[in-house]
A protein has these predicted regions:
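C-terminal alpha-helix
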Residues: 296-304
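Short amphipathic alpha-helical segment that frequently serves as the phosphate-/nucleotide-binding helix
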Residues: 46, 263-264, 294
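Alpha-helical and His/Cys-centered functional microenvironments
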Residues: 47, 59, 114, 287-290, ...
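Catalytic histidine-centered segment of alpha/beta-hydrolase-like enzymes
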Residues: 281-290, 294
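Short, hydrophobic-biased amphipathic alpha-helical segments
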Residues: 136, 293-297
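Flexible "cap/lid" subdomain of the alpha/beta-hydrolase fold that forms the substrate-access gate
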Residues: 1-18, 24-26, 31, 51, ...
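Conserved HGGG/HGGXW glycine-rich cap/lid loop of the alpha/beta-hydrolase fold
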Residues: 30-75
């Protein structure tokens, strides 16, 4: 858990807010007009709200922008007596949304932010207006057998091979010193963005073994298949999910989720919705192409009032 007031040399200048109503202290950013349309930005592995630092300012000129840190990430608390699962992260989000009484939300989800956004929507569709996916999957699309599986990605192969040797746990539970390497394995492309402040910001949530439990459990949750029951439990809400306007931004250098899989999954659910393919952009499009995300998000909202 990072010092709430650390701005990382002014690169994250947003007032901290906290919510402790769901068993841990959760940090979130809340910028822009309180009566504005709500954009709720969800990060994934192994990042935190810092991922959206270049988007919050421009977007908050027109919208209310809320950026939570998941339990075990960023400036949020890392309790050791909690389960770090898709279910728990989704339930944590639901508690925060209810606390803030957010409505007509534009959900933005990258990496694990996509499944969390999806599971939130199938259970709380009345609060969601639109969904903006970025290098992620909803997971409910029926795709052809010729489409690569998520398990075919370089990231998932790395996880599986490392579980046999102990490498996966060693690397991820030491994320404070390995976070850049992990992001490169997943598909981080923009090395020009990396400086001492960048390294410190992404390393700071993980000063020791225990603090990195969330970074370890995210991929294990998927690799082990333990997310399946919770995902299947949301099937009744898929009709509500696909009724929402949606868009997918897909960096084609993604090594966590095969781009062909992400696109096929999305098009199976939203066959007429836009897919924006980004050559040369990796898994972290917020880092690799920040201006593209802001422009496309604004246009998406304007096109779906």
């Amino acid at each position: 858990m990072i010092d709430l007031h650390d701005t990382f040399d002014g690169t994250f200048p947003f007032a901290p807010h906290t919510f402790d109503g769901h068993g841990f202290v959760q940090h979130y950013v809340d910028e822009g007009p309180r009566d504005g349309q709500v954009i709720l930005c969800l990060h994934g592995e192994p990042t935190w709200g810092y991922l959206y630092r270049k988007r919050v300012g421009p977007l908050s000129e027109h919208y209310r922008v809320v950026v939570p840190d998941h339990m075990g990430f960023g400036k949020s608390e890392t309790p050791l007596d909690r389960e770090y699962t898709l279910r728990s992260h989704t339930e944590n989000l639901a508690a925060l949304v209810e606390h803030l009484d957010l409505r007509d939300i534009t959900l933005v989800g990258q990496d694990w932010g996509g499944p969390i956004a999806t599971q939130f929507t199938v259970r709380h569709a009345e609060r969601v207006k639109r969904i903006f996916f970025a290098n992620t999957i909803a997971g409910y699309g029926r795709v052809g057998a010729d489409v690569p599986e998520v398990s075919d990605s370089g990231w998932f192969r790395w996880i599986g091979e490392g579980l046999e040797t102990g490498r996966t746990e060693q690397v991820l539970r030491n994320a404070g010193s390995t976070v850049l390497s992990v992001m490169k394995i997943i598909g981080f492309q923009n090395s020009a963005a990396v400086d001492d402040t960048w390294i410190r910001a992404y390393s700071a949530p993980f000063p020791d073994w225990d603090s990195a439990i969330g970074a370890y459990e995210f991929p294990i949750d998927a690799y082990s298949g333990r997310i399946a029951d919770y995902v299947m439990g949301g099937l009744d809400g898929v009709a509500d999910l696909v009724s929402k306007p949606a868009i997918l931004l897909e960096g084609l250098e993604d090594r966590a989720i095969p781009p062909a899989r992400a696109i096929a999954d999305f098009r199976a659910l939203w066959p007429d919705a836009p897919v924006v393919e980004l050559p040369g952009v990796g898994h972290f499009c917020q880092e690799d192409a920040p201006e593209i995300l802001v422009t496309n998000l604004h246009q998406f909202i304007q096109a779906n009032p």
